[in-house]
Amino acid sequence: MKTNIKVFTSTGELTTLGRELGKGGEGAVYDIEEFVDSVAKIYHTPPPALKQDKLAFMAATADAQLLNYVAWPQATLHGGRGGKVIGFMMPKVSGKEPIHMIYSPAHRRQSYPHCAWDFLLYVARNIASSFATVHEHGHVVGDVNQNSFMVGRDSKVVLIDSDSFQINANGTLHLCEVGVSHFTPPELQTLPSFVGFERTENHDNFGLALLIFHVLFGGRHPYSGVPLISDAGNALETDITHFRYAYASDNQRRGLKPPPRSIPLSMLPSDVEAMFQQAFTESGVATGRPTAKAWVAALDSLRQQLKKCIVSAMHVYPAHLTDCPWCALDNQGVIYFIDLGEEVITTGGNFVLAKVWAMVMASVAPPALQLPLPDHFQPTGRPLPLGLLRREYIILLEIALSALSLLLCGLQAEPRYIILVPVLAAIWIIGSLTSKAYKAEVQQRREAFNRAKMDYDHLVRQIQQVGGLEGFIAKRTMLEKMKDEILGLPEEEKRALAALHDTARERQKQKFLEGFFIDVASIPGVGPARKAALRSFGIETAADVTRRGVKQVKGFGDHLTQAVIDWKASCERRFVFRPNEAITPADRQAVMAKMTAKRHRLESALTVGATELQRFRLHAPARTMPLMEPLRQAAEKLAQAQADLSRC
C-alpha cells in the first residue's frame, strides 16, 4: 500500500515515499517513486543532531566503491526543505537474502541446492572485500553480525545497516555503540556496554574471520564444540572470552574440541588454517588478526586451487586433498551438498568391466621377498650380572637346602647339630635373594625380546604390504570385492526403489520437518547464542532434533532439551501424510542418482586399482628398499635379544 508521504532531499528535491517494505525498532524502509533503484529509511523519531551530522557526512562522501558493497546513504531526507534529517536514501537491495540462507546447510539445501563449496568460497571472499572497502575509507563496521549481510545468487554481498557503522568524519568519530555478543571479540566480551567505546579494524577482523568460518564450515561457530574441561561449553560468550577455539591446533589445552561429524579444518591449506588460528587466539589480540585485504588475497588464491570429485560435481574441494571430504562426510550421514543427479561426472562412458577385470587377472605377482632374518646373525649373548646364578644353579641350591632340612629333622635336634641351623638360614637367604634378582633379570630380557620381535614383525608386515605377495593378494581381493559390488548394483537399485513404499510416510514427515528452522523459531530459553551452539552440532531444523543430539550440546540440560523436544512435537502435530504423493518422481530420481554415483565411484576406484595392481611388481623394489635397512637392524636387534635371553 502506497503512503504518498512527501519528503525532501538535502538539495531540496521533492520525493514521494511509496509502499512500506519493512519496519524495525529504529525506523521503516520505503520505496521511492522517483528513484526506483533506491529506497528510503525513515526514522520513527528524528535522530539526535550528532547522528544527523554523521548521515550528512556519509551521504556527502558516498562513492562507487562504497555503493558497490554497502547500502550506503546517497542523500539525507528531510521533512521540509532545510529541515532536520529524518532519514536517508540508499541503494535498493533486491534479489538477495540474509547470509545465513547460504551458510546454513539446511537453508541452502532448500533455497540454493545448486550452490557448491566453490560458490561459498566466493561469497566468503566478497564478505572480506566489503570489509576491505569500509576499512580503506577509514571507517569500522563495528556491529558485525550475520544479519548485516545480504547475498545474491551471483555471490555478490551487500552490507546493510550502514548508519550504525563507526564513521571517521575528518577526525570526528561517530561511534558504533551496539554489538552482538557471539560476534564480539574476546578482548571486548567483558565490556558492560559499547557506549563511548572506540572500535578498531582489528575488532572488525574478528567478526570477519567468524563470518568466513561460518560460510566455509556449514554455519558452525569456532568457539562451540565438545567440552574437554568442566567449565567449558556453558556459555558461548565465556568460551570466546577464554579463547576456547575448538579447532585450534592446541585445542586440548583450550578445553574444547570440534563437534562430532563437523568439517575438518585440515580441509583448508595450512596457510589459511593459520589465518583462523591467528584470528581466534591470543596472538590476534597481541599482534593483530588477518586483515580484510589478506583474506581477499588468500581466498582468491584458494579459488584457483580447487578440484571436483569424480563422483559428484557438487563436491568441490581444495586440490591439496587426496580424498573428497564431502564423500567422507556423506558416508557418515552428514549431507552438506545435494547431488541432483544430472550433474554427476561420469568416468567417460568407456568403462568396460570385462576389460578392466582382464587387467586385474593379467597382473603378475611379485617374487618372494628376500628379507633379513634373525637367524642370519650370530651374536654373543650378554652374560648374567656378576654374582647372579643361572637358573639351574638356583634349582640345585634349593634341592640342597631341602635335603639338609630333612637331614636336620632326622637327627632329632641333637645339640651338636644345632650349629647347622644358621647355616641353613644363610643358604636360604642367599638362595631367596639370588632367585629374586634372577627373575627380575629374566623379566627384563624377555620384555626386550618381545619388543624387538614386535618391531621386527611390524616391519615385515609393512614390507609385505607395499611390495610382497601378501600386499598383492590383499589388493586383488579388494578389487574383486569392488567387481562384485558393481555386478550387484542393479539388484541393489531394485531393492532401494521397492523400499520407497515402506519409507514413504517417514520421508514425507522428514521433508516436512526440514521446513521448520530453529534460527527463526521461538523456543523458551533458547536465544541466539544457544541457537548458534545447536547449529554447530548440526541441529538446524525440527528434523535434526533428537533428545540425545540436543543433550550432547553443553548447556542444554533436561529443561532446555525438553523445550526443544516440545517445539519439535508442535511441528510434528501439523504433519498430514499424503498417500497420493507417497512416491514422487524426485524420490525415484534420488535413488537412481545415488546408485549412479556409487557406480561411478566403484568404476573409477576399480580402474585405478587395476592399473596399480599391474604396476605392483614393477614398483615393489622402490617401495621396499627404504624399509630394508630398518628391517636388517630390527632383525639384528631381535637376534641379540634372543641370545641375551638364552643366557638365563
Curated annotation (Swiss-Prot):
Its EC number is 2.7.-.-. Autophosphorylated. Dephosphorylated by PphC. SUPFAM superfamilies: Protein kinase-like (PK-like). The active site is at D143. Coiled coil: none annotated. It comes from the Bacteria. The keyword DNA-binding does not apply. InterPro entries: Kinase-like_dom_sf (IPR011009), Prot_kinase_dom (IPR000719), YegI-like (IPR016960). ATP binds at L21, G22, K23, G24, G25, E26, G27, A28, V29, K41. Residues 15-302 form the Protein kinase domain. Keywords: ATP-binding, Kinase, Nucleotide-binding, Phosphoprotein, Transferase. GO terms for molecular function: ATP binding; protein kinase activity. Probable serine/threonine kinase. This is Protein kinase YegI. The lineage of its organism: Bacteria, Pseudomonadati, Pseudomonadota, Gammaproteobacteria, Enterobacterales.
